[in-house]
């Protein structure tokens, strides 16, 4: 933590107690909340809380969600927003190379020996369509999803895409908001949250 390294809990079947121990050891973030991680399980007749429950009960844990409207449906997006809030929830694309590309075949991972996937219905799927194989969402889509599907205020959705992740990563001294002395990173979008201009450190790098 002194070196601003962010240890994160992800893709695990850990129990609540194990997450609690990890948190005391310095783990303060959870990657892709709900994706490939434990919730309430039953072991030898007893129920055990998992990573998901720990995310809500341990106050200093921050989370990120793949808010494409597919990995997490509307009720779960609303649940995370209601109980973790915009200051402890970051939006994450988790996008693979199929993002922004037409539907069809793609490869997850290495181009030489990676996993073949199918891009359709706004998400990457395994060839047999038995599971998701990654996201193809862009950041503007995440904001649109939170506003138009989950019904949260635009200002909170933007915060979850900008200042909150910057704070989690300890780079909010230069990123995450428009303030004197910070990098001039600006997105201009229309009423439907479609990107019109992208400005990076004061330079226009995209114009529609």
Stretch-by-stretch model annotation:
Residues 13, 35, 69, 160, ...:
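Residue-level "edge-of-site" marker
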Residues 15-17, 38-39, 71-73, 163, ...:
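Short secondary-structure capping/turn micro-motifs that flank functional sites
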Residues 34, 96, 192:
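Anionic group-transfer/hydrolysis microenvironments
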Residues 39, 75, 101, 192, ...:
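Active-site-proximal flexible loops/turns
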Residues 47-65, 69, 76, 81-93, ...:
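His/Asp/Glu-enriched, well-ordered alpha-helical/loop segment
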Residues 174, 180-193, 197-208:
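C-terminal regulatory/interaction regions
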Residues 1-48, 100, 202:
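Histidine/acidic-residue-rich, glycine-tolerant segments that coordinate divalent metal ions
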């Amino acid at each position: 933590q002194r070196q601003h390294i962010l240890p994160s809990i992800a893709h695990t079947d850990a129990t609540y107690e194990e997450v609690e121990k990890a948190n005391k050891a310095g783990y303060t973030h959870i990657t892709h909340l709900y994706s490939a991680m434990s919730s309430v399980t039953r072991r030898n007749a007893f129920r055990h809380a998992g990573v998901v429950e720990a995310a809500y009960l341990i106050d200093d844990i921050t989370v990120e969600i793949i808010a494409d409207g597919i990995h997490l449906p509307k009720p779960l997006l609303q649940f995370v927003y209601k109980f973790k809030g915009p200051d402890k929830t970051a939006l994450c694309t988790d996008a693979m190379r199929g993002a922004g590309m037409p539907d069809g075949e793609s490869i997850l991972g290495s181009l030489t020996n990676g996993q073949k996937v199918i891009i359709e219905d706004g998400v990457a799927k395994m060839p047999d369509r038995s599971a998701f194989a990654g996201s193809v969402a862009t950041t503007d889509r995440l904001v649109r999803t939170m506003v138009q599907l989950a019904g949260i205020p635009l200002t909170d959705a933007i915060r979850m895409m900008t200042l909150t992740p910057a704070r989690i990563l300890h780079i909010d001294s230069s990123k995450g908001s428009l303030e004197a002395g910070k990098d001039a990173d600006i997105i201009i979008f229309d009423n439907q949250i479609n990107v019109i201009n992208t400005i990076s450190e004061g330079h226009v790098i995209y114009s529609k």
